Amino acid sequence: TGQRLGDISNMKFSDIWDDHLHIVQEKTGSKIAIPLSLKLNAINWSLRDVVARCRDYAVSPYLIHFFRATSMAERGAQVKSNTITMNFSKARDKAEINWGVGTPATFHEQRSLSERLYKEQGIDTRILLGHKNQNQTDRYHDDRGKNWTTVRISQQ
């Protein structure tokens, strides 16, 4: 859904009602209700599909939780933001992607990718990302330098 890391970490099953995931965004205080039917065509998953995958055999109020006990947390405990970031980086590094001269992707860059993909689908990404104005959202419309900007010249 392109939500911020802290908001993802804080999501609870109790935030779901009326077929929407309700989020009060940490950073801005924006209140958004995202339909569970929201689908990202690029991966063919809806928010409902993601929520269903969060339900497992560990009882937890949190969507993102530990499914087994570790030395750091009990089963069902909330996974904090720094743990999500650290494990994203570990998974990214295990993928052994050649980033060339660029820097490896960060967890936060998924927010930018989500913005671009949902915008292609016609979703109002300013509202989805919880921004007050379009300029904030436009900063997320970055493809890591993959596309070229063509200079247009007038015909004389």
Protein language model regions, located:
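Exposed loop/turn and edge beta-strand positions of beta-sandwich/beta-sheet ligand-binding modules
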Residues: S30, A58, E109
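Active-site/catalytic core of tyrosine-dependent DNA strand-transfer enzymes
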Residues: S37-V101
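Key DNA-contact positions within bacterial/archaeal DNA-binding proteins
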Residues: G6, N82, N135
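N-terminal/domain-start segments enriched in small and hydrophobic, helix-friendly residues
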Residues: N82-A95, D142-Q156
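Catalytic-site neighborhood detector that most strongly recognizes the C-terminal catalytic loop/helix
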Residues: Q25-G29, L129-Q155
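Short, basic (Lys/Arg/His-rich) helix/loop patches that form interaction surfaces
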Residues: T1, T85-I127, H131-N135
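Conserved beta-strand positions that form and line the central face of beta-propeller blades
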Residues: H22, L63, T106-E109, R139
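Conserved tyrosine-mediated DNA breakage-rejoining catalytic core shared by Y-recombinases
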Residues: Q3-R53
